[in-house]
């Protein structure tokens, strides 16, 4: 009976974040939220009901009477181990405060590497026949696109595919703007295309001969603003919803406030780490809708 309440609370808080994620997410994010909720419900059903049935069945047949859940290694692994967390509360609080200040400082000064989901712009995933350096590709495109923001990151591990993000002419409307930008991209990347391919081949999503665009995405400024607003609200509502559930469940405002502060701290540390290390680590730390989904999932599990 004591175990059930802990299992129920931990699963319900994760479902709360899944529901919020479904309501504020789009496309694949909603799919992830649906999968998360279904997975939690099935896991809860099997852990609480089916597992109990199996154990009762075998025990009623006088089997598994001496079953244990330890091994020779784990049985004595934590014997006589005592961590005096509360005795060193000032140390942990000081370390946490320093970490929070550092993260806030980096977020305020360096910010985050935002994807076009939050800035608006175009993504082009381009595959080459030979390995290329992202910085080399960025310089070629920057010369052609002038003052527009251009970022290039490697995709995969073969070194032949990159994702190009730019806000070049994103404010312009018209039927020919997209095709003109693809033509500019073709001209800029000619030095690294291995064959004398035509523009038609380069923009053909099904033809990878000599290097070509294999996918593209456009997010307009108004859509990017809506996504940004939804992302902020989803995180705030997740914190408040879990805090409200804790208040209703345990009837103690201190528990509710403590849970919100702890979850907000965890979220701040995640954002701070991304702010500190983007551009330093050899892989992308770009913030997009998938990242927001990961943060909400972390919030749901962190409360446990």
Indicate where each model-derived feature is located:
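A structural signal for conserved, well-ordered secondary-structure elements
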Residues: 1-304
């Amino acid at each position: 009976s004591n175990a059930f309440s802990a299992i129920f609370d931990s699963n319900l808080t994760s479902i709360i974040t899944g529901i919020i994620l479904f309501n504020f997410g789009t496309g694949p994010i909603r799919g992830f939220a649906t999968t998360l909720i279904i997975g939690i419900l099935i896991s809860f059903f099997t852990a609480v009901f089916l597992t109990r049935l199996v154990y009762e069945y075998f025990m009623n047949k006088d089997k598994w009477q001496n079953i244990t859940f330890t091994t020779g290694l784990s049985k004595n692994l934590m014997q006589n181990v005592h961590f005096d967390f509360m005795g060193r509360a000032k140390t942990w609080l000081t370390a946490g405060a320093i970490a929070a200040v550092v993260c806030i400082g980096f977020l305020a000064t360096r910010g985050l590497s935002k994807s076009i989901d939050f800035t608006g712009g175009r993504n082009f995933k381009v595959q080459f026949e030979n390995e290329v350096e992202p910085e080399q590709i960025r310089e070629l495109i920057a010369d052609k696109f002038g003052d527009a923001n251009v970022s290039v990151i490697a995709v995969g591990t073969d070194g032949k595919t990159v994702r190009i993000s730019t806000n070049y002419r994103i404010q312009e409307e018209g039927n020919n703007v997209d095709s003109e930008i693809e033509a500019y991209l073709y001209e800029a990347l000619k030095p690294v295309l291995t064959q004398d391919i035509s523009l038609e081949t380069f923009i053909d999503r099904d033809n990878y001969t000599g290097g070509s665009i294999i996918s593209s995405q456009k997010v307009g400024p108004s859509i990017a603003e809506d996504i940004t607003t939804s992302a902020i609200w989803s995180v705030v509502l997740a914190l408040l919803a879990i805090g409200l559930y804790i208040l209703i469940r345990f009837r103690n405002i201190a528990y509710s406030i403590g849970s919100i502060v702890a979850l907000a701290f965890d979220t701040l540390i995640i954002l701070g780490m991304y702010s500190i290390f983007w551009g330093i680590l050899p892989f992308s730390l770009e913030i997009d809708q998938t990242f927001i989904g990961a943060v909400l999932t972390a919030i749901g599990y962190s409360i446990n």
